[in-house]
């Protein structure tokens, strides 16, 4: 799972002002994202049959590139189209209920603070998304930025759980994020609003891979 989190692209139709979401996602897939989440929220978000139809089209794209297709906070849609997994927040469906309904799917959980981490039923989730790293405008209900604090604190007590950092992340922050213990980064605007999506995605993937190699070298020296 940790390798799958290297470059996690989160996107919905409201995040794509320059191009159609299908074009954006396919370019990101071509350039090296390792996981995709369909997060369809906001005042102009698709609903009902339109949302289902879009999810199916995005799912087909992801299958073509062998990238897992995750849906945000809509377990019914996950079940309906047999998506690869579900991502939920602290105030969404309880994770134990999600696992009961999706025994063989990927389940991710958002965590912001150590208090949330300690109260979460982590035995039934496949990864946690920690953030927001920086202040972000992509989520109207975003919590205060936590930087690397929570990631570092979690890594000190849990070396095994897969962690992806999210929230206002650009390539400039990748090294510090990976160094703090995250296995990858999740981004919205860094890809969806980029002038050149392929170039931006490749740069992010390059920075993640480089940071992971450097962290491993540092770990080997310490050993």
Swiss-Prot record:
Transmembrane segments: none annotated. Its EC number is 2.5.1.3. InterPro entries: Aldolase_TIM, ThiamineP_synth_sf, ThiamineP_synth_TenI, TMP_synthase. It comes from the Bacteria. It catalyses: 2-[(2R,5Z)-2-carboxy-4-methylthiazol-5(2H)-ylidene]ethyl phosphate + 4-amino-2-methyl-5-(diphosphooxymethyl)pyrimidine + 2 H(+) = thiamine phosphate + CO2 + diphosphate; 2-(2-carboxy-4-methylthiazol-5-yl)ethyl phosphate + 4-amino-2-methyl-5-(diphosphooxymethyl)pyrimidine + 2 H(+) = thiamine phosphate + CO2 + diphosphate; 4-methyl-5-(2-phosphooxyethyl)-thiazole + 4-amino-2-methyl-5-(diphosphooxymethyl)pyrimidine + H(+) = thiamine phosphate + diphosphate. Pathway: Cofactor biosynthesis; thiamine diphosphate biosynthesis; thiamine phosphate from 4-amino-2-methyl-5-diphosphomethylpyrimidine and 4-methyl-5-(2-phosphoethyl)-thiazole: step 1/1. The keyword Metal-binding applies. It is an enzyme of class 2 (transferase). Mg(2+) binds at residues 73, 92. Coiled coil: none annotated. Keywords: Magnesium, Metal-binding, Thiamine biosynthesis, Transferase. GO terms for molecular function: magnesium ion binding; thiamine-phosphate diphosphorylase activity. It holds the Pfam family TMP-TENI. Condenses 4-methyl-5-(beta-hydroxyethyl)thiazole monophosphate (THZ-P) and 2-methyl-4-amino-5-hydroxymethyl pyrimidine pyrophosphate (HMP-PP) to form thiamine monophosphate (TMP). Belongs to the thiamine-phosphate synthase family. This is Thiamine-phosphate synthase. It comes from Streptococcus agalactiae serotype V (strain ATCC BAA-611 / 2603 V/R). The gene is thiE.
